[in-house]
């Protein structure tokens, strides 16, 4: 039997739906009018949907596990300030590749991707923190009944920071498109911005490549097992309702972070591919 079968999770639920379901179960758990039977069902909902949210997040991560991001330096290195200094007017109206959905300049878009990658460097730490915090609840006698043994504050803080940056990203994007192109002059305010965009993208690549995605995947899977064990413990020995609410909040936050990191790898891959196309084309013209 697959380890995912134990909590009867649905396999084809998008993460945003899974997180929404988890948050709904957490809200239900706060309802002081619940009967004992209703309370048990709410507890099962928190753990099964929390488990599922982590599973969906790790499945997204598996899609990006092997990708190492790098700019094609053979083209990028040809684009020096000296080579580009007198060609901007000639290039302004030329149509060049952009990442699908980009609705700003390359410098703005790559700079935000870099900022996101700085945030994601702590993804492993957050997953391991959650695993450690849940492990402490499990290993402490009657820990499952102690509302003070677990704090969700750091997870909620990270989630708020993530959502703030995702809101910024949404403002820099429009609906996804295929074969996205823009006028050179609209995505680069001067030729130096092409060089600058390459430099920013290199830093982002380094940040993303520095995260061991295989190790992160294994850490999420171990945390999932802890969630399953905690669920069984809660149903067999009793629990603190407030504690389970905090754990549910933390699991939702970590699942969102893992999924957002996975999406950022894909987004950076699109940036690199588009920049490679621009670098190849422009290096052949100057």
Task: Enumerate the language-model features and the residues they cover.
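Leu/Val/Ala/Ile-rich N-terminal alpha-helices, chiefly Sec-type signal peptides and the beginnings
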Residues: 1-107, 113, 117-120, 134
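Long, low-complexity or tandemly repetitive, helically biased scaffold regions used
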Residues: 73-286
């Amino acid at each position: 039997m697959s380890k995912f079968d134990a909590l009867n999770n649905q396999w084809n639920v998008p993460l945003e739906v899974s997180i929404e379901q988890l948050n709904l179960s957490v809200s239900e758990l706060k309802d002081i009018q619940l009967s004992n039977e209703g309370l048990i069902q709410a507890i099962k909902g928190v753990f099964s949907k929390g488990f599922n949210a982590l599973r969906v997040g790790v499945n997204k991560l598996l899609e990006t596990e092997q990708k190492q991001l790098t700019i094609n330096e053979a083209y990028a290195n040809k684009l020096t300030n000296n080579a580009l200094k007198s060609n901007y007017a000639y290039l302004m109206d030329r149509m060049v590749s952009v990442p699908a959905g980009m609705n700003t300049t390359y410098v703005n878009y790559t700079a935000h991707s870099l900022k996101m990658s700085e945030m994601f460097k702590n993804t492993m730490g957050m997953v391991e923190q959650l695993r450690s915090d849940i492990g402490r609840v499990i290993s402490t006698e009657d820990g499952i009944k102690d509302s003070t043994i677990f704090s969700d504050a750091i997870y909620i803080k990270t989630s708020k920071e993530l959502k703030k940056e995702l809101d910024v990203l949404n403002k820099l994007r429009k609906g996804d498109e295929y074969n996205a192109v823009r006028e050179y002059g609209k995505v680069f305010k001067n030729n130096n911005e092409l060089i600058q965009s390459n430099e920013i993208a290199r830093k982002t690549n380094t940040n993303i490549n520095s995260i061991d995605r295989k190790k992160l995947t294994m850490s999420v899977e171990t945390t999932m097992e802890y969630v399953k064990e905690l669920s069984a413990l809660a149903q067999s020995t009793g629990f603190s309702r407030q504690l389970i609410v905090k754990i549910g909040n933390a699991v939702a936050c970590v699942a969102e972070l893992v999924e957002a990191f996975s999406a950022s790898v894909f987004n950076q891959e699109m940036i690199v591919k588009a920049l490679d196309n621009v670098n190849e084309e422009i290096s052949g013209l100057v």
